[in-house]
Amino acid sequence: MKRFTAALVFGLVLFGCGGSVPPRYVLERDVGDFRYRRYQHVLDIEVPIEGNAAQGHTASYIRRDPNDQTSIATAFVTVYAHAASLAAEVADSLRSLNSYEMSVQDAGAGYAWMLQGASGDKWLLWVSRERVVKVGAPPGEDVPEDLVDAYMSLYPSDLDEHGRAREGTESAGTSHRASEEAGGEELPASLREGAPR
């Protein structure tokens, strides 16, 4: 009986402490040196995809240094209606941003796209099922590892070392642009291979 009780308690602790998705999709708590500041729900998303409606959720975090200077980091979680082809669609959109250099980076627990702006701003983005997660750094700083780790534990990256969705992930599939270039027929996102039925 003791062994059963111990196993039950261990299971409850293990699964009870797991990374379940927060009700408003972002972490509304302090993370590392950054203190949670505020939440905002947004309808004007950064990567609109035709035929795949989405809503955004953002959280701001603030850090004060010993000289009372403040730094602000941001996390943005966009939730799309479905995951099919999401990684390819987002990658196409990111490649079209002329003001950013894009690369793929090992973020520890998974791969992410790194966007670096001419003004020194840096962002890590990745796709996790039907969600796109974007974590931004204070100007001139690296993206805070604690924030990336916290969000990556909630939203594991679907990306591989080349910045494409790993085979078998829900966000895998060909983008609309790539299908057109390959001579494929124009299909709405909901009818593409891998779309939920």
Q: Where in the sequence are the language-model features?
A:
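Sec-dependent signal peptide recognition
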Residues: 2-8
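C-terminal motif of bacterial Sec signal peptides marking the signal peptidase cleavage site
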Residues: 14-16
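Bacterial signal peptide processing site
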Residues: 18-21
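Short Gly/Thr-rich strand-loop-strand
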Residues: 24-53, 83-123, 157-181
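Short, surface-exposed beta-strand/loop micro-motifs that present aromatic residues
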Residues: 56-67, 114-115, 120-127
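A short acidic-to-branched-hydrophobic micro-motif
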Residues: 58-88
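Short, well-ordered beta-strand elements
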Residues: 126, 130-138
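Surface-exposed amphipathic alpha-helical segments
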Residues: 137-197
